[in-house]
Amino acid sequence: MICTIFATDQMGTFGNRGTLPWKPNPEDMAWFREHTLDQIVVMGRKTWDDPKMPKPLPSRINCVITNKPIKTPNVRKLSGDYKKQICELQILFPNKNIFILGGPDIIMDCKDLIDYAYVTHRKGAAFSDVRIDLKAFMVGMRITSSRPSTDKMLNFSIYKNVDIFRPL
C-alpha cells in the first residue's frame, strides 16, 4: 500500500523554518513509529534536510526525492518521474507499505497514488511557513478510524482514498 503520514492543524500547518512547527509530542512520535517502522519512507529533500530528523530514519528503507547527491549510505534517491518510482517500490518490496512523509507538494502530487492517509490533527494553530491545502487533500478521503490522544490535544485519524488511481 501507498500511504501518507503527517501532522497538521486546522490551518494546514505543516512546517516552519525547515522543521516541525511545534514541539515533538511523544504520543504522536509513537504513532509515527508504530506505522512506519520496518516500512518504506519517502520524502522530499527539504523534509530530509530537517535538522531535527535522524538520518536515515532507523529501521526503515529511506527514499529521498531530489536531483542532488545523497551522501548518506543506504538511502535511495528518487528523481525524475518519482511517482512511477514510488509505484515500482511496491513491486520491489511487495511486503512493505510505503509512507510519503512530505512535503505538502509531494503529498498533493501523489494523492492519486495514496491508499490511506494517517493524519494527526492538532488542536490550536501554530505559526508556519509551509502549509498543506487540507480542503483539497480531503476530497475523496473517507475516515476509517479516529481516536484522541491521552491529553485530548491530538486526534489520530486514518482515511481511505476512495478516488485512487494507479497509473501502472
Model-flagged regions — what are they?
Residues M1-L168:
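Enzymes that bind and transform nitrogen-containing heteroaromatic metabolites
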